[in-house]
UniProtKB/Swiss-Prot annotation:
Substrate binds at residues 45, 179, 185, 305. ATP binds at residues 185, 204, 220-228, 269, 305, 431. InterPro entries: PEP_carboxykinase_ATP, PEP_carboxykinase_C, PEP_carboxykinase_N, PEPCK_ATP_CS. Involved in the gluconeogenesis. Catalyzes the conversion of oxaloacetate (OAA) to phosphoenolpyruvate (PEP) through direct phosphoryl transfer between the nucleoside triphosphate and OAA. Monomer. It comes from the Bacteria. Mn(2+) binds at residues 185, 204, 241. This is Phosphoenolpyruvate carboxykinase (ATP). Its main location: cytoplasm. The keyword Lyase applies. It comes from Pseudomonas putida (strain W619). Its EC number is 4.1.1.49. The lineage of its organism: Bacteria, Pseudomonadati, Pseudomonadota, Gammaproteobacteria, Pseudomonadales. Keywords: ATP-binding, Cytoplasm, Decarboxylase, Gluconeogenesis, Lyase, Manganese, Metal-binding, Nucleotide-binding.
Length: 513
């Protein structure tokens, strides 16, 4: 299709998109065949530039505030028209994709991008259906125009870039953003608003499935280990980041993975390593003179990324879905060295820690957070992506856990033997040992020890894991220092939890001073 002197490229193949990106100077090829691109001054998401249009059909259901910022409908319409006109005056790329692998819950999406590489990214991360929109549902539109510069005084934006979701119009506008993660997270936010109305819990988690059909969920913020731990050569990958949990099913919302690349190694992450080949996209990864990726080089960002389709993963779940989860794992990266490598949670503790979402920002995906590491609380282990009040998601989680009988665990992938700078981080093999024990069922009904201040129950033995690591107090040389650190962490938890209106039983399930 041609408009004026420009071409609209529709549903190009991976090979064609790579060719277009190279011809247009958008990136270069690594020695593996992956397309390598740079995203400019934004190398992570920009939460301050994300808005939701305020309109009658959804305004009373959204938890408005610093995360879900209001945007006027008339300003949105004007800006959409402006960006669309800018995009229509030049070559651009259109693909028709789905978000949501379950037949009952997919969204059909027309994805329009100014650049070939961002279209390739979308083809990696979204689902490329054999038949587009077989149920004939209303279509969503994503318009992603990287080189458009917003003018805040004219457009009502916060800066030269924006991500704006309009539920009534079924539109997502992304302007001035080269960091492609904005596109996937915008559609994640859309599903996170829509799915609870269908009694489906949307989740910021990874998922995999064992040979016997047992499913494990891995909740966690960026950098806590979702992608790494779910990419297990002994299990089938469902997905690494975005899922829905409904009656009888856990389904991936995506068709690909978006892995952090910092210090990536073939030894520790063989599944991810092998997936980075022709058709994959490397964002902000530095190449050496031989076009070989240097994953230790953080000169562009600590948030370097690899986007690849699930087809690049040898062991993957058929149809990107599985049954309900036997094990639900909350991954937390504890900077204080106070939390144990694994705790067994009851339902009230599960609700408490799901609402708290305690972890650390590690090589954060958000702009402005810098390279430093700091503790944070992110409700539902993904606060930036959940438009509804947090309690609605927590109620759905407990409903699903109760109905299926899932077991819930808190797994610390952070520090032990002291806090950050003193202790050491749990090794990936140690954490994999914990995960393997959980998945084998070895921790169900096992003998536990109660840790008073942090109010957690830890197993006395975990197959394949050193026993002295299980009670964190034992790993500290200075026991009094551990007790003080535990009290400090408990105070952080209780201060953060004051904002939640929940039952006394859930309040009592957290750390106690």
């Amino acid at each position: 299709m041609t408009q004026a002197n420009n071409t609209v490229y529709t549903d190009l193949s991976v090979d064609e998109l790579v060719k277009e990106a190279l011809q247009r100077g958008e990136g270069v090829l690594a020695d593996t065949g992956a397309l390598v691109v740079e995203t400019g001054h934004r190398t992570g998401r920009s939460p301050a530039d994300r808005f939701i249009v305020e309109e009658p059909s959804t305004q009373d259901a959204i938890a408005w505030g610093p995360i879900n910022r209001k945007f006027p409908a008339d300003k949105f319409d004007a800006l959409w028209d402006r960006v669309e006109a800018f995009n229509n005056a030049q070559d651009h790329f259109v693909s028709y994709v789905h978000v949501g692998a379950a037949a009952e819950h997919y969204l059909p999406v027309k994805m329009t991008t100014q650049t070939a590489w961002q279209n390739l990214f979308g083809r990696c991360l979204f689902i490329n259906p054999e038949q587009f929109n077989p149920a004939g549902r209303d279509q969503w539109q994503v318009l992603n125009v990287a080189n458009f510069e917003c003018v805040p005084e004219r457009d009502g934006t916060n800066s030269d870039g924006c991500v704006i979701i309009n539920f009534a119009a079924k539109k997502v506008l992304i302007a001035g953003m080269r960091y492609a993660g904005e596109m996937k997270k915008a559609m994640f936010s859309v599903q996170n608003f829509l799915l609870p109305a269908a009694d489906v819990l949307p989740m910021h988690c990874a998922a995999n499935i064992g040979e016997e059909g047992d499913v494990t969920l891995f909740f966690g913020l960026s950098g806590t280990g979702k992608t790494t731990l779910s990419a297990d050569e002994s299990r089938y990958l469902i997905g690494d980041d975005e899922h829905g949990w409904g009656e009888g099913v856990v389904f991936n919302m995506e068709g690909g993975c978006y892995a952090k690349c910092i210090d990536l190694s073939e030894k520790n992450e063989p599944v991810i390593w092998k997936a980075i080949k022709h058709g994959a996209v490397l964002e902000n990864v530095v190449l050496d003179g031989n076009k070989h990726a240097d994953y230790a080089d953080v000169s562009l960002t600590q948030n370097s990324r690899a986007a690849y389709p699930l087809e690049h993963v040898a062991k993957r779940a058929e149809a990107n879905l599985g049954g309900e989860p036997n094990a639900v794992i909350f991954l937390t990266c504890d900077l204080t060295g106070v939390l144990p490598p694994v705790s067994i949670l009851n339902n009230e503790q599960a609700a408490y820690h799901f609402l708290s979402g305690y972890t650390a920002l590690v090589g954060s995906t958000e702009m402005g957070s810098g390279g430093g590491i700091k503790s944070t609380f992110s409700t539902c282990f993904g606060a930036p992506f959940f438009p509804r009040p947090a309690g609605e998601y927590a109620e759905l989680l407990i409903k699903r856990i109760n109905a299926f009988g899932s077991k819930v665990y808190l797994v610390n992938t952070g520090w032990t033997g002291g806090g950050y700078g003193v202790g050491k981080r749990f090794s990936i093999p140690t954490t994999r040992g914990v995960i393997a024990a959980i998945q084998s069922g070895a921790l169900v009904g096992t003998e536990t020890e109660h840790l008073d201040i942090i109010n957690l129950d830890v197993p006395k033995a975990v197959p394949g894991v050193e026993t002295e690591l299980l009670n964190p107090r034992n790993t500290w040389a200075d026991k009094a220092a551990y007790d003080e650190a535990a009290k400090g962490l408990a105070k952080l938890f209780t201060e953060n939890f004051k904002k939640f209106e929940v039952s006394d039983a859930i309040k009592a399930a957290g750390p106690q001073l």
